[in-house]
């Protein structure tokens, strides 16, 4: 079953997904600029999350990008920064959430170690290792359940 949900992004009718086989649930959230209550409710109870961690705020601010692009990426309809993604993770965390993939990392405005640092507090404990998707090669298959 696929359950699409809307997100705040500067595209026409942007949607993300909650996928389920009836027993297990995967939430996919990328290309969102800010947190909405509908987004959080759509991701509740997932066994696995693929979560955008697009940029580090400081790296984006200090980047060579023009001011207009920085404003777009970091704005309400742009992309999720590491700290906002950590807030989403904390809001969606429950005992059954076993798998987390950080995805859509900017090659210019983020680093895997910054993502790990931002998500560490919420993701601590007896869960599977945090997987960080490589912007070029993705990540290996993960068995959910």
Locate the predicted segments by residue.
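Class I S-adenosyl-L-methionine
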Residues: 131-143
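Cap/insert and terminal regions of metallo-dependent hydrolase folds
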Residues: 37-134
């Amino acid at each position: 079953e696929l359950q699409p949900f809307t997100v705040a992004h500067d595209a026409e009718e942007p949607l993300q997904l909650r996928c389920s086989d009836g027993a297990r649930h995967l939430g996919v959230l990328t290309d969102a600029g800010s947190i909405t209550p509908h987004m959080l409710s759509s991701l509740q109870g997932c066994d696995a999350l693929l979560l955008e961690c697009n940029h580090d705020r400081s790296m984006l601010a200090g980047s060579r990008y023009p001011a207009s692009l920085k404003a777009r990426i970091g704005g309400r309809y742009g992309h999720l920064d590491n700290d906002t993604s950590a807030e989403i993770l904390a809001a969606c965390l429950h005992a059954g959430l076993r798998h987390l993939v950080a995805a859509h990392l900017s090659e210019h405005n983020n680093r895997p170690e910054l993502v790990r640092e931002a998500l560490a507090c919420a993701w601590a404990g007896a869960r599977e290792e945090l997987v960080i998707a490589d912007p070029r090669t993705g990540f290996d298959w993960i068995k959910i359940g």
